[in-house]
């Protein structure tokens, strides 16, 4: 089955509604700024690179009714501000919005909307190049017949192209064959169960779904060669914010001597943060924990702590894979590694 995660044609933005997977693949149009905001907040689109890409095209959608470049520049700050508040942890969102802001400031009077669209398309093209490069670097760390664990969803659904960590595993299976991927269910939103298994099935990669709390037992009794995760924000020292549960997985991997790899484009690296202590962590609705899918599973009025992300210390990360190459730990100077 082929599927399109995001399409922008004739000034119309369409995305695959990921909240309806794996049951049905439904495309929805994001026709105005509120629909773009809601799509990002509600996880119709998710994954740091795809959030940024959606926001980039979302600026075009929000401003396509402007009558002139000056009107677009006047309305632009409010659009950028509103989109910046949708998901605070994913630094790719802010990277894309900064790109669109720079474009807005320099808009020509003639062909201004085409210039805005061209910038969003340039972001899209960069993601394609980054994904391909990361897959090439990452597969060098995989052996034929590798058995890997992954967390959350980091495939095409997360970037709109090939993906980050899952993109490496899909590419590795195509290159070497014999891969087997163990997929954390990834509570409380079940991105592993709902999205990653769907993608692996579509790409015909052998896989097994596991409970989040069974990864350590799997490493101990069944044998795992490596763990692969993405990232929503990486500090300059390599501390990595990713979907909640990643930190636990890294601790388990270290205890069992299993390499732990982070795959993310350089746009996910926030060099303004020296370490992970300053990474903002999004807190989501407690009902995602107490009543997943609207079905109560806890006693009435039970409080729940529901951070969307946690931060894995750099010393637990074996290597960070970006489009620039494989950056090996246990210490990282990402500013130097990325040539910034």
What are these model-derived regions, one by one?
Residues 24-35, 144, 221-230:
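Acidic-glycine-rich active-site phosphate/pyrophosphate-binding loop
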Residues 27-33, 155-159, 236-241:
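Short, glycine-rich nucleotide/cofactor-binding loops
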Residues 178-179, 185-340:
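Conserved phosphate- and dinucleotide-binding cores of soluble alpha/beta proteins
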């Amino acid at each position: 089955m082929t599927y399109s995660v995001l399409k922008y044609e004739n000034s119309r933005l369409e995305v695959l509604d990921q909240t309806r997977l794996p049951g049905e693949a439904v495309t929805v149009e994001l026709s105005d700024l509120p629909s773009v905001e809601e799509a990002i907040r509600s996880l119709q689109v998710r994954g740091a690179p795809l959030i940024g890409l959606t926001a980039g095209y979302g600026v075009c959608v929000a401003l396509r009714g402007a009558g002139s470049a000056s009107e677009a520049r006047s309305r632009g700050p409010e659009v950028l501000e509103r989109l910046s508040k949708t998901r605070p942890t994913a630094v790719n969102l802010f990277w894309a919005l900064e790109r669109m802001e720079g474009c807005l400031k320099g808009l020509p009077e003639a062909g201004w909307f085409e210039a805005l669209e061209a910038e969003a398309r340039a972001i899209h093209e960069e993601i394609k190049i980054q994904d391909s490069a990361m897959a090439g670097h990452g597969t060098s760390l995989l052996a034929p017949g590798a058995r890997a664990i992954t967390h959350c969803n980091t495939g095409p659904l997360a970037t709109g192209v090939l993906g980050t960590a899952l993109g490496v595993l899909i590419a590795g299976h195509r290159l070497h064959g014999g891969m087997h991927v163990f997929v954390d269910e990834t509570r409380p939103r079940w991105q592993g169960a709902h999205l990653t298994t769907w993608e692996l099935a579509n790409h015909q990669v052998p896989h097994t779904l596991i409970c989040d709390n069974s990864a350590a037992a799997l490493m101990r009794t069944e044998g795992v060669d490596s763990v692969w995760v993405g990232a929503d924000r990486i500090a300059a020292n390599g501390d990595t914010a990713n979907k909640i549960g990643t930190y636990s997985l890294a601790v388990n991997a270290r205890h069992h001597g299993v390499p732990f790899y982070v795959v993310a484009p350089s746009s996910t690296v926030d060099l303004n943060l020296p370490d992970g202590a300053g990474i903002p962590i999004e807190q989501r609705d407690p009902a995602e924990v107490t009543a997943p899918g609207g079905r109560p599973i806890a006693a009435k009025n039970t409080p729940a702590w529901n951070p969307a992300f946690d931060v894995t210390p750099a010393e637990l990360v074996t290597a960070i894979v970006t489009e620039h190459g494989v950056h090996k730990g246990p210490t990282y100077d990402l500013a130097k590694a990325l040539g910034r």
